[in-house]
UniProtKB/Swiss-Prot annotation:
Belongs to the HesB/IscA family. Binds 1 iron-sulfur cluster per subunit. One of its GO terms (cellular component) is cytosol. GO terms for molecular function: 2 iron, 2 sulfur cluster binding; 4 iron, 4 sulfur cluster binding; iron ion binding. Pfam families: Fe-S_biosyn. This is Iron-sulfur cluster insertion protein ErpA. The gene is erpA. Required for insertion of 4Fe-4S clusters for at least IspG. Iron-sulfur cluster binds at C44, C108, C110. The keyword Metal-binding applies.
């Protein structure tokens, strides 16, 4: 799937998330890496979010670009993430990527798992 106008995207990511991805890519010295977001079964609420760096974009993957970096989501995960936003936070509890997901009916305390 190709990039679309930002207001029509099924998932987006914040400037903070894009900046952190860019920083990590610069450290790795590999501009081919993309942030892949996925959903798997598990966690205390039924589903959990996962983040990894990947050089490949598979057939059917959705990609969106911001500040020169790409976010990639597989079709199965995308159905649970429509309308969501990937963000990055750094604070007293540590630093992490997280998903603001309007489809989640419940989330765990740490925000890493959810149910729909």
């Amino acid at each position: 799937m190709t990039e679309q106008a930002e207001d029509a995207l099924p998932i987006s990511f914040t400037d903070a998330a894009a900046l952190k991805v860019k920083t990590l890519l610069d450290e790795e010295e590999n501009d081919a890496l993309k942030l892949r977001v996925y959903v798997t079964g598990g966690g205390c609420s039924g589903f959990q979010y996962g983040f990894t760096f990947d050089e490949k974009v598979n057939e059917g993957d959705f990609t969106v670009e911001k500040q020169g970096v790409q976010l990639v989501v597989d079709p199965m995960s995308l159905q649970y993430l429509v309308g969501g936003e990937v963000d990055y936070t750094s604070g007293l509890e540590g630093s992490r990527f997280f998903v603001k997901n309007p489809n989640a009916t419940t989330t765990c305390g740490c925000g890493a798992s959810f149910s729909v």
